[in-house]
């Protein structure tokens, strides 16, 4: 992987990631394909929304279908027929999400397989092996996602263990002679001093990119913004920065304002299935009865297949009838909205009008622009 940084405006960055499987223009949003599919979409449909890179889930793909089935096909690209780049998370967040059914030790994590109840163990080395078999273009280190809330001492112990796991991940990745990219994950909860230690430790180990983890786990937005404002300036300029599991359109804009290059989130796909559709002025709840007779498209500014062909009334009808097509059309629209948003952000940075873009973005939502410290 090669990262090129073309232009900056304030802390916002315009660049690109180059892989053997294709180029990713940044800032970029990655749709989530947890089980080797973006729910309800073919790879061709996902590509048509403008997506350049997908996220796959190491934990879930390890449990089902497993490494052997994956290797029979070649790797995850061959299995799901997505031939662009793929980033895989390490499984750390999913293990964190298991709650009381898991036991974390220095060696790794013992837990019950949520599929069949079997006892299972995952550690840094196993995560690297699974991601190697998946053929991930970007591999994530194995870490512990620090929960919120956490005391300073709890966050410190969690972050320090993640650093030790980061070194183990790096060692095993190098031992495999994996030709792809390996990203470190910064932890430390909402504590700036712990984030500093994490950044120092990870940059000393050395990675191809750096993710900010442990955010969007329940903390107030102000804390997320504060941690990003504090952390991003410390990261190497020549390496990509990835904000994990974020988020709403506003979160993407705020992340870019603070120096983030990459995002992923289930929000556009999950919200689509629940009838929450993102448009230029905010959100349309298609289940609202006022849309029953509305013959206009979701968003007159949108060029997606859904908006070019169907009315709000039709989407309302499909939702009321629980038709699968409704979820698919909604998903196409939401994914395209996110990609259009990222393309607009990239153009604005290129043309030195990102500040104006931000003002217009919030004006369309009748909201004030959130403050940006140390801009």
Curated annotation (Swiss-Prot):
Reaction catalysed by this enzyme: 7-aminomethyl-7-carbaguanine + guanosine(34) in tRNA = 7-aminomethyl-7-carbaguanosine(34) in tRNA + guanine
Gene3D superfamilies from the UniProt entry: Queuine tRNA-ribosyltransferase-like
Keyword presence, Transferase: yes
Main enzyme class: transferase
E.C. no: 2.4.2.29
Name of one Pfam family that matches: TGT
Residues annotated to bind substrate: 89-93, 143, 187, 214
Keywords for this protein: Glycosyltransferase, Metal-binding, Queuosine biosynthesis, Transferase, tRNA processing, Zinc
Pathway: tRNA modification; tRNA-queuosine biosynthesis
GO biological process, one term: queuosine biosynthetic process
Cofactor(s) it depends on: Zn(2+)
Leader peptide range in chain numbering: none
Region named RNA binding: 245-251, 269-273
Binding site for Zn(2+): 302, 304, 307, 333
Similarity-based family: Belongs to the queuine tRNA-ribosyltransferase family.
Protein name: Queuine tRNA-ribosyltransferase
Gene field: tgt
């Amino acid at each position: 992987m090669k990262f090129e940084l073309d232009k900056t405006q304030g802390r916002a960055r315009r660049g690109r990631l180059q892989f053997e499987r294709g180029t990713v223009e940044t800032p970029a949003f990655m749709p989530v394909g947890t089980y080797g599919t973006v729910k309800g979409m073919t790879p061709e449909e996902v590509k048509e929304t403008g997506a350049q890179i997908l996220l796959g889930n190491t934990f879930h793909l390890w449990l089902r279908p497993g490494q052997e089935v994956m290797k029979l096909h070649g790797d995850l690209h061959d299995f799901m027929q997505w031939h662009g780049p793929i980033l895989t998370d390490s499984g750390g967040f999913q293990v964190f999400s298991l709650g009381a059914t898991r036991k974390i030790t220095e060696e790794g994590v013992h837990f019950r397989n949520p599929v069949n109840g079997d006892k299972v163990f995952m550690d840094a080395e196993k995560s690297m092996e699974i991601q190697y078999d998946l053929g991930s273009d970007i591999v994530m280190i194995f870490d512990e996602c620090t929960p919120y809330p956490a005391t300073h001492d709890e966050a410190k112990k969690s972050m320090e263990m993640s650093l030790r796991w980061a070194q183990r991940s790096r060692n095993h990745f190098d031992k495999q002679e994996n030709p792809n990219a390996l990203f470190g994950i910064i932890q430390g909860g909402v504590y700036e001093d712990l984030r500093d230690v994490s950044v120092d430790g990870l940059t000393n180990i050395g990675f191809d990119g750096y993710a900010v983890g442990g955010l969007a786990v329940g903390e107030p937005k102000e804390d997320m913004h504060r941690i990003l404002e504090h952390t991003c300036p410390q990261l190497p300029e020549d390496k990509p920065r990835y904000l994990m599991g974020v988020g709403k359109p506003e979160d993407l804009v705020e992340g870019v304002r603070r120096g983030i290059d990459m995002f992923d989130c289930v929000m556009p796909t999950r919200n689509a299935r629940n009838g929450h559709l993102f448009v230029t002025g905010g959100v349309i709840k298609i289940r609202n009865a006022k849309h029953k007779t509305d013959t206009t498209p979701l968003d007159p500014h949108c060029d997606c297949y859904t908006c070019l062909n169907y009315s709000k009334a039709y989407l309302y009808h499909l939702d009321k009838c629980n038709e699968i097509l409704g979820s698919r059309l909604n998903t196409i629209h939401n994914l395209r909205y996110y990609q259009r948003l990222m393309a607009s952000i990239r153009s604005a940075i290129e043309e030195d009008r990102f500040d104006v873009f931000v003002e217009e973005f919030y004006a369309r939502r009748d909201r004030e622009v959130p403050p940006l410290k140390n801009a």
